[in-house]
């Protein structure tokens, strides 16, 4: 789960793998009546209207003022930086389309947000809708905030969802790649019956190239291949780790079946219960607790690939393992931080806890992992979490039906430490490799069993 890049990756690799993108909005209030776009951005309370005007200069104005009014640091932000980011993206879009304008320059700005906007709007004139969309994307990207998003809802495709069926890759962190990713890049999940499955693409297959472009340049992941996933067909050069065989496969998007996220569980040797939680979606905590109603002596909670969700689900699930604990803080720009606490209405399980994490454990998953480690509630096994937890986002409706998602507060861990961009380190390092996936091994679970 939002911006153009998110939709690009989700369309090709499947939206189910993009839950980190959606977690920015997961903590917003439960939708009530539908919002109506007006002259200013308004807090969204339901699905955007289906019939809306195109993106205009006024839409960009709304986004600009919305950031200054509602974003965490908006009230003290230099508005000139926003306009600079917006025009940079606007002109780059024009250049890519061979439509640059000789008269298009950033006017002299004073730092007064109203007079600067008036000068900026005069330069734009009526504006180019595609370039205006790029400008909003660029302005939001300039915040460098993993929970700030601009979303343009698109109607579902006729005939149901389509994609390749590749539902995850090893370096993926929501709409982008982990900047700390190490080679190789490999597939982690393939949907049954999908075009990828029919092409005999399997978990563990190493992506050497995408449309002829290498997945890694030296030891650095090539972020440019993200956009290449949207090609239809897409050409993948794959290496099977069990045999070393390399082949090139061309895949066209086709019908896929999206299963809603669900909690799964099994009993491990020795009596411990393994529970896999794919996201902190509404009701997820109670689903996990229901799987543990037998009050097992030990629990292995698998949060690998968990892209986040609602902070309320985090505190509720933590309440099954401890009471009276501060789990995190939400801090405004000015004023006191507000502590989040375990939901002590939940009955304690009294179980030992091992949590499996990876670099795709993000947002609310970062939050949960930090609370477990910071409060000594259990042991973390796997790899460091994503560190994508700037703060919960709230949605604001713009006049073209798009939604701006902005955090109003900053997240801190239970000791008031910053988790965002850093992540939560594990107690025992046990990464999943391509060969592990291809052969059905699970080093994280194996390590958890030794601890229990």
Regions found by a protein language model. Name each.
Residues 51-52, 186-189, 197, 202, ...:
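Cleft-lining beta-strand/loop regions that shape enzyme active-site pockets
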Residues 1-10:
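Bacterial N-terminal signal peptides that target proteins for export
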Residues 9-21:
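Bacterial N-terminal signal peptides
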């Amino acid at each position: 789960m939002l911006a153009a890049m998110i939709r690009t990756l989700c369309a090709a690799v499947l939206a189910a793998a993009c839950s980190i993108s959606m977690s920015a909005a997961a903590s917003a209030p439960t939708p009530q009546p539908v919002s109506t776009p007006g002259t200013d951005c308004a807090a969204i309370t339901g699905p955007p209207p289906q019939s809306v005007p195109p993106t205009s200069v006024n839409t960009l104005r709304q986004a600009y003022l919305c950031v200054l009014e509602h974003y965490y640091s908006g009230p003290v932000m230099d508005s000139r930086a926003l306009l600079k980011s917006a025009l940079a993206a606007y002109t780059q879009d024009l250049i890519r389309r061979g439509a640059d304008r000789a008269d298009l320059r950033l006017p002299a700005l004073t730092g007064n947000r109203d007079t600067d906007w008036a000068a900026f709007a005069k330069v734009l004139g009526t504006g180019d809708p595609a370039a205006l969309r790029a400008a909003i994307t660029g302005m939001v990207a300039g915040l460098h905030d993993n929970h700030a998003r601009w979303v343009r809802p698109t109607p579902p495709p006729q005939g149901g969802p389509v994609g390749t069926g590749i539902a995850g890759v090893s370096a993926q962190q929501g709409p982008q790649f982990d900047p700390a990713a190490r080679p190789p890049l490999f597939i982690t999940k393939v949907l049954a019956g999908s075009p990828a499955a029919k092409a005999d693409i399997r978990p563990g297959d190493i992506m050497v190239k995408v449309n002829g472009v290498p997945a890694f340049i030296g030891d650095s992941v090539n972020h440019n291949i993200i956009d290449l996933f949207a090609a239809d067909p897409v050409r993948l050069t794959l290496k099977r780790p069990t045999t070393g065989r390399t082949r090139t496969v061309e895949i066209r998007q086709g019908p896929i079946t999206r299963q809603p996220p669900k909690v799964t569980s099994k009993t491990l040797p020795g009596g411990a219960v393994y529970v896999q939680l794919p996201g902190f979606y509404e009701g997820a905590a109670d689903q996990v607790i229901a799987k543990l109603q037998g009050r097992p002596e030990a629990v292995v909670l698998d949060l690998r690939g968990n892209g986040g969700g609602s902070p309320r689900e985090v505190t509720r699930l933590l309440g099954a393992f401890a009471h009276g604990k501060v789990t995190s803080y939400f801090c405004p720009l000015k004023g006191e931080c507000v502590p989040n606490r375990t939901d002590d209405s939940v009955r304690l399980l009294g179980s030992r806890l091992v949590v499996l994490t990876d670099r795709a454990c993000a947002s609310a998953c970062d939050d949960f992992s930090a609370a477990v480690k910071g409060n000594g509630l259990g042991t973390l096994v796997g790899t460091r979490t994503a560190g994508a937890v700037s703060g919960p986002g709230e949605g604001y409706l713009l006049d073209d039906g798009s939604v701006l998602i902005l955090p109003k507060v900053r997240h801190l861990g239970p000791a008031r430490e910053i988790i965002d961009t850093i992540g939560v380190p594990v107690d025992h390092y046990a990464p999943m490799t391509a060969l592990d996936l291809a052969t059905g091994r699970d080093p994280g679970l194996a390590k958890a069993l030794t601890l229990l």
